[in-house]
Amino acid sequence: MDQAKSKALEAALSQIEKQFGKGSIMRLGSDRTMDIDVISTGSLGLDIALGVGGLPRGRIVEIYGPESSGKTTLTLSVIAEAQRQGLTCAFVDAEHALDPIYAAKLGVNIDELLCSQPDTGEQALEIVDILTRSGAVNLIVVDSVAALVPKAEIEGEIGDSHVGLAARMMSQAMRKITGNLKNSNTMCIFINQIRMKIGVMFGNPETTTGGNALKFYASVRLDIRRTGAVKEGEEVVGSETRVKVVKNKVAAPFRQAEFQIVYGQGISKAGEIVDLAVANNFVEKSGAWYSFEGNKIGQGKANTMKWLLENKPTMDKLEGMIREKLMSKPQAETSARLATQEELADDY
């Protein structure tokens, strides 16, 4: 770039920053660290599958799945992890179905959790926008998009046609809150339900409610499914759960994680650590016995999990080893890619 153009560009950049604030425009390569501020999901496997160690702050996240698949449990787990970091959380309960006793069992501090039960969809989304613009709330959960009923539909009669009202409402809200979420570094999680498209012969007939705007604006979309039951003898004590990262703007998508949700306790962290430690050869499995550093720690997965819960230092050590091995790769790849870009730039 010649000197005259360079001076003109610098003057334009200076004017933009003066008018709209510092950081309103920048060179993409100026911030080499590219560190993403995240909140853990409470699931070690899912944090790894997300590629950055959790859900990104300042972004929109969508979690969807069938009924009783663990959507609310996963979001309450995220809230509990956020509160452990000292963050302020809000729960917009459009379904009017939040159980504070269950939330407390999952580790949520219900005394510190802000909760709203709005009457209309517009009211719910306006509350989200006000909380976001305040800059004082770090995580907002909306449960659920399907329950965000437009005011016109509530005031009308059953049987009245309201085609596209919810989709238009969501589209307008996404345009309004996305920039505010980024500026305030607030994460907004939308829980969504599944519907079936009528007359689909080929492909997946499943779709989510609320139109297409949320699909486009969400940085992360998680598809959560119940794959089986967790039993103790004949009694069902939980569910096997699989989460697929359907969309990811901050790392590689299409990874998945499997974990157990134990009724009344939430995500089984010990179970995940056992599975991941065996898969990465930190724990040896011989027949039914599990061994760590040459010592037998349990016969069967259930006993091994129990042993880990009773020996917290070993459990923390294993978690650290798993995180170090599986979460350091993306950073190393990023550094290598930046180094390659610098070499190419030098060649030119």
Swiss-Prot record:
Gene3D superfamilies, sorted: P-loop containing nucleotide triphosphate hydrolases
Annotated stretches, region: Disordered: 328-348
GO cellular component: cytosol
Domain of life: Bacteria
Keyword ATP-binding applies: yes
Keyword DNA repair carried by entry: yes
Residues that, per the record, bind ATP: 65-72
PROSITE patterns reported in the protein's UniProt record: RECA_1 (PS00321), RECA_2 (PS50162), RECA_3 (PS50163)
Principal localisation: cytoplasm
Localisation per UniProt entry: Cytoplasm
Pfam families named in the record: RecA (PF00154), RecA_C (PF21096)
One GO term of the biological process aspect: DNA repair
Keyword field: ATP-binding, Cytoplasm, DNA damage, DNA recombination, DNA repair, DNA-binding, Nucleotide-binding, Plasmid, SOS response
GO MF: ATP binding; ATP hydrolysis activity; ATP-dependent DNA damage sensor activity; damaged DNA binding; single-stranded DNA binding
Signal peptide limits: none
Family designation: Belongs to the RecA family.
Physiological role: Can catalyze the hydrolysis of ATP in the presence of single-stranded DNA, the ATP-dependent uptake of single-stranded DNA by duplex DNA, and the ATP-dependent hybridization of homologous single-stranded DNAs. It interacts with LexA causing its activation and leading to its autocatalytic cleavage.
Classification via NCBIfam families: tigrfam_recA
Protein name: Protein RecA
Organism: Ectopseudomonas oleovorans (Pseudomonas oleovorans)
